[in-house]
A protein has these predicted regions:
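Structured alpha-helical
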Residues: 11
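Cyclophilin-like peptidyl-prolyl cis-trans isomerases
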Residues: 4-8, 16-222
Length: 222
């Protein structure tokens, strides 16, 4: 899903260019069965997602590693290996379709980029696209995951067992909808760039908005 439902022959030919690298320090941040939360600060607002580390550990480890910069990736402009620099910071949501999804995570910002490697799908959990707000991997076909991801604003059942679901939005879904409805070109590219500024990670759920305090009782004249 670099074009979500389509992929050019040229990109398909690139799929085998690099094997998945060995595990690294990013994997230590992801403990199987323990929730990980990612907060995406965008130019349109903040989105927080819960990552499914038990159900899609390989995918979550990859996302975490690229978000922190602990996983090496290839700079598409220079071809150099990058270590210690988060891939996602400063990237854009390059494709948005109202009532469907928003897509980002491409270091080239074109929908054709990747981190210089591919890794396998994870469908063993049986999760399906049964609700909006699911976070999933974009790909160019079976077992071609890289860095691109999308967040749904619909329930696209035709994507079941085609794209690994590895998280869900827990706060900021209104921001997802807002991004999905920005003015866009005929190619579904936002006319004004929507930037993913930073991703921060935590093993604790964000605090829910404080409930409004009850109004003080009116004093009764004596």
């Amino acid at each position: 899903m670099h074009r979500l439902l389509g992929i050019t022959a040229a990109l398909a030919a690139v799929v085998a260019l690099a094997a998945e690298p060995a595990a690294g320090p990013w994997t230590k941040k992801v403990q199987a069965g323990k929730d990980v939360y990612a907060t995406l600060k965008t130019s349109q607002g903040v989105i927080t997602v819960r990552l499914f580390s038990k159900e899609a550990p390989r995918t979550v480890e990859n996302f975490v590693g690229l978000a922190t910069g602990e996983r090496a990736w290839t700079d598409p402009k220079t071809g150099a290996q990058v270590k210690g620099k988060p891939l996602y910071d400063g990237t854009v949501f390059h494709r948005v379709i109202p009532g469907f999804m928003i897509q980002g995570g491409d270091p080239t910002g074109t929908g054709m980029g990747d981190p210089g490697y591919r890794f396998a799908d994870e469908f063993q959990s049986g999760r399906t696209f049964d609700k909006p707000g699911l976070l999933a991997m974009a790909n160019a076909g079976r077992n071609t995951n890289g860095s691109q991801f999308f967040i749904t604003t619909s329930t696209p059942s035709n994507l079941n067992n085609r794209h690994t679901i590895f998280g869900e939005v827990i706060t900021g879904y209104d921001v997802v909808e807002k991004i999905g409805n920005v003015p866009r070109s005929a190619e579904d590219r936002p006319q004004t760039p929507v930037v993913l500024e930073t991703i921060t990670l935590s093993d604790k759920a964000p605090n829910a908005p404080a409930a409004p305090k009850p109004a003080a009782p009116k004093s009764t004249p004596r």
